[in-house]
UniProtKB/Swiss-Prot annotation:
It comes from Arabidopsis thaliana (Mouse-ear cress). Residues 1-25 form the signal peptide. Oligomer (believed to be a pentamer but probably hexamer). May play a role in plant defense. Probably has no oxalate oxidase activity even if the active site is conserved. GO terms for cellular component: apoplast. GO terms for molecular function: manganese ion binding. This is Germin-like protein subfamily 1 member 6. Residues 65-216 form the Cupin type-1 domain. The keyword tRNA processing does not apply.
Length: 227
């Protein structure tokens, strides 16, 4: 009986050791688009941000004011996103969370985009929003969408294309939480047709089955200003 118990104990210790080694060897999630290994010690960037001396930390490092203020939505999208991430609240560093306020004019939208480093959870506090996300190619690019009213919540899985659009004739407001201190944002149209330098027109024309002249026009619309 004692021999059986001893074997069980040894097995548990081995499994615990293996689990601990897996945890300690796991790479941290990226906190920016890329982190290239640096050979020059005087030009070192870390995955995230360096830590401030704890003795010099104050309450101001953990706070942000003004998220109650409505933002200007007089732009071609009719929306404004106010992000509160580690760049606004230094105390968020290493904590893995951030948030944003989304303001929408009548018919305004937050166009199809992705957050490469975070899942998003959104709650509507004013108006009605049509929201949705598209699953991956493996899942046949299914669209999951819903109209949200005040108090409704919706989740957008990490890395999937999603959008929000105001479907009422009044302003709409929502707040979003992210599972990263720096979730990142890639607006699909801006990235594809406004990259710098531009993706070759022939590539986009074939990929989207468009005329090269239309691709050239879209490069002008979404590309950097010409003046």
């Amino acid at each position: 009986m004692m021999e059986v118990l001893l074997r069980l104990l040894v097995t548990q210790v081995i499994l615990l050791a293996l689990a601990t080694s897996f945890v300690s060897c796991y790479d941290p999630n990226p906190l920016q688009d890329f982190c290239v290994a640096a050979s020059e010690t005087n030009r070192v960037f870390v995955n995230g941000k360096f830590c401030k001396d704890p003795k010099s930390v104050t309450a101001n490092d953990f706070s942000y004011s003004g998220l109650n203020i409505a933002r200007n939505t007089t732009n071609f999208l009719g929306s404004n996103v106010t992000t509160v991430d580690v760049n606004k609240i230094p105390g968020l560093n290493t904590l893995g969370v951030s948030l944003a306020r989304l303001d929408f004019a009548q018919g305004g939208q937050n166009p199809p985009h992705i957050h490469p480093r975070a899942t998003e959870i959104l709650v509507v506090t004013k108006g009605k929003l049509l929201v949705g996300f598209v699953s991956s190619n493996q899942d046949n690019n299914r669209l999951f969408y819903k109209v949200l009213k005040r108090g409704d919540v919706f989740v957008f899985p990490i890395g999937l294309i999603h959008f929000q659009m105001n479907v009422r004739r009044t302003r709409a407001v929502a707040f979003a939480g992210f599972g990263s201190q720096n979730p990142g944002t890639i607006r699909i149209a801006d990235a594809v047709f406004g990259s710098n330098p531009s993706i070759p027109q022939e590539v986009l024309a074939k990929a989207f089955q468009l005329d090269v002249k239309l691709v050239r026009f879209l490069h002008i619309v979404f590309g950097p200003p010409l003046w």
